[in-house]
Amino acid sequence: MMRVARAIAPLYPQLNVDLLIAGILFHDSGKLWENHYAESGFVMDYDERGELIGHISIGLELVNSLWRKISADKSDAWKNLTPPSEDVRLHLLHLIGAHHGEQQFGSPVDPKTPEAMALHYIDNLDARLEMFAAGYLTAKPLANRIFERVWPLPGKLVKSLEIFRASASESKPNDQLL
């Protein structure tokens, strides 16, 4: 996700890439407490805290807790940053709170900044493309390159064409056309 953010940042100068990267790092941090990971393997059992509070709320709580610890530091060096630390905290909280994109999908707020919108779409794109990759490995094949539906993707999966490559006798495509 960070590579996607860094790749699109030059195309959208209104994005604060540092804030976006911080949002990428923290947006799902609450899942560490939402999900219960058994010692015997990577199985996510249900957890009461996660069910009652959810990873977004837990992530917001985590960032606030870390910020309080930083605020207690006697050093004033971090207090004079630009933009002001409190503004950064507020915007980071917004990124975490809005990363599901809409309230109907669990976000307490809709994305209201370019970074929040970018994080939502980067996260969504990452999740969906991972679903395709996993589906090609686990879904039942129905025909050549066609697989049964993997929820929540729409319809059956169709495997992509192979990556285009010029044959040895052909010249490379003209990059200037792109």
Task: List the model feature ranges, each with a label.
Residues 4:
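A Trp-anchored, charged/polar loop motif used as the substrate-binding/catalytic surface
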